[in-house]
Amino acid sequence: MAADYEPKPITTEHIVLSDEILELVELLAENAHDIWASERLRDGWTFGPERDDTKRQHPCLVPYAQLPDRDRDYDRTMVIGSIGAILALGFTISHTHSGVDPAP
């Protein structure tokens, strides 16, 4: 790390997420997990009770709903940070209610 590097995350403490956005958070957290899991499976990883980089096994290669709370919370925290930054930067998020099912 460069000695002069000072992280400056966007301030989001003033952002309040609506119930609708919190529903979006959960959908995006699950999607983030699915993207991560798809990449691992594509790279030859399998489920294992403990992480083992040599055997390419990982205990989180399960459906999102089966993840331990701490792992789901990690995904949610990352999504909340991103959505909070989007809103803090003055963008809006709206739902078109198109009826499209988010799952294939």
What are these regions (language model features)?
Residues 1-104:
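Alpha-helical propensity feature that highlights long, continuous alpha-helices across diverse contexts
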